[in-house]
Every structure is written in C-alpha cells, then in structure tokens.
Amino acid sequence: MKKKVKWAGLLVASLIVLTACGTGPVTSQSTDAWDRLIYWFASIIQFLSINGQIGIGIILFTILIRTLLLPLFQIQMNSSRKMQELQPQLKKLQAEYPGTDMESRQQLYEATQALYKENGVSMRASMIPLFIQMPILLALFQALTRVEALKVGHFLWLNLGEPDPFFILPILAAVFTFLSSWLTNKSAIEKNMAMTIMTYVMPVMIFFFAVAAASGVALYWTVSNAYQVAQTLVFNNPFKIIAERQAKIDAEKERQAKIRRAQKKAQKKK
C-alpha cells in the first residue's frame, strides 16, 4: 500500500509540473511536446464539431477518450475489487504480526505479498492504468482551457468561453461526480473514512469550479462524470457485486448447515 501511495504521489507531482510549466495559449506554432499533444486533441475536437458546433465536438471527443481508456479503467477497477475482497484476510495477517519491530514488519510484508500473489493481485499493475489515464485526461482538459478556438461559439444556451449563466452544468457536474464516487464506494467491504468524506466534498468542489469555469470545461466535466456513472453501472455495478457477495455467503452458510446436519445424522446412527 505504501508503494501505491508513493507512485500515486509521484504521478500527482508530475502532473502538477506539467500543468505549472504550461499555462499559456497553445497554437499550431507551439513546439513543446506537451503543447503539441494538447493542440492535437484540440484539432480532433474541432474535426468532430458537427456544423462547427464545438460543444458537440467536446461531447464526442470526451466519450471517445473515455471509451478508449475503458480497458485500462477495468484493469484498475478489477484490481481494486480484488483488494477489497482480500481485506478480511489482510486484517487476519495484521493480527498475526502485530509487532512494530523491523522483523515483524518484514514478516507481515512477506505474508501480504504472498497473499497478493496467490490471488493474482499486483500493486504495480493497478497503478499502470492510472499513469496512462491521468496525462491523457489532463491534456484534454488543457485543450479546453489553453486553445482559443475551443473557447468561442455557442452550444444550446451556453457561450463556451463564459460560465454557465443558469448553473445547469455546474449542478449536473456535481451530481454526476457524487454518483460516480458513491457507486464506486457502495460495494466496498470496509468503508474508508477518507473516501467517504471525498464522496461528499468533491461534488461541492466541482460545483464551485464549474461555476467559475468556462462552459466548455463544465461541459467536459459533466459528460466525463456522466460517462463514469454509466460505465460503473454497466461494468462494475455495485448492487450486482453486493448481491453476488451475499449469494456466496448464503451458499457457504447452507454448505456448513448441510455438514452439521450430516454430522448429526451420523451421530444418531452410532
């Protein structure tokens, strides 16, 4: 887990550097590799803009990117799900090796790694999708904020370069952000307090960011989080996961009950 946090911290630091190093306008004359990627994304959005409707281009490109990243997302979600399923066993290991000395910690680490290996869980493999996804999504976000061509035009009631005057997109972005986090945490065996707090804090933050942001950016947040909700319901439906988990528990209880009944019958025959 510490390694996972370390790698996640490294990724966040790298993204902050990328963001800080590039805040000015991006044009066809930009030569920096990161800026070229941003401009390439912007060009695709313009290509997808039916009848010059940049809003449609933003929606289609967001859906396209999220769909292409779907296999990576699934790898990450499957790894997280396996980790959740192993929580009871991990707690048992922690109870077996409660010591804080170096030897006890090493024994706990080795036992944990053996458990991961036995169940096909790889911490490194679970981080790789994150390393690939985040820069792509950041480049898409910066295409909307740093390429002037994507800041102009109207879509429905929106002026894409200005905030939503009716707060419709900020509200939708916040609602879908909440639903996405809530659905992801719904099937967790053990509720993480930090994740629970973030489930309620993030939507509020997204709302205020979207209120101040250009409508093009708010549109991206809304579509991206709506896609995330649909994706979770289709591929990682928490209600289905909970039902399957309960079915396994019930089946095990029934199996144990049959064993006890068989043992009682055997004792009566004696």
Swiss-Prot record:
Subcellular location: Cell membrane
UniProt keyword terms in alphabetical order: Cell membrane, Chaperone, Lipoprotein, Membrane, Palmitate, Protein transport, Signal, Transmembrane, Transmembrane helix, Transport
PROSITE patterns: PROKAR_LIPOPROTEIN
Record carries keyword Signal: yes
Annotated lipid attachment (N-palmitoyl cysteine): 21
Positions where lipid (S-diacylglycerol cysteine) attaches: 21
Source organism, top-level taxon: Bacteria
Family annotation (InterPro entries): YidC/ALB3/OXA1/COX18, YidC/Oxa/ALB_C, YidC/YidC1/YidC2_Firmicutes, YidC_ALB_C
Chief location category: membrane
GO cellular component: plasma membrane
Disulfide bonds: none
Transmembrane segments: 44-64, 125-145, 163-183, 201-221
Signal peptide: 1-20
Molecular-function annotations in GO: membrane insertase activity
Keyword Transit peptide: no
Membrane topology: Multi-pass membrane protein
GO biological process: protein insertion into membrane; protein transport
Matches recorded under Pfam families: 60KD_IMP
Family affiliation: Belongs to the OXA1/ALB3/YidC family. Type 2 subfamily.
Functional summary from the UniProt entry: Required for the insertion and/or proper folding and/or complex formation of integral membrane proteins into the membrane. Involved in integration of membrane proteins that insert both dependently and independently of the Sec translocase complex, as well as at least some lipoproteins.
UniProt name for this protein: Membrane protein insertase YidC
Organism: Streptococcus suis (strain 98HAH33)
Gene: yidC
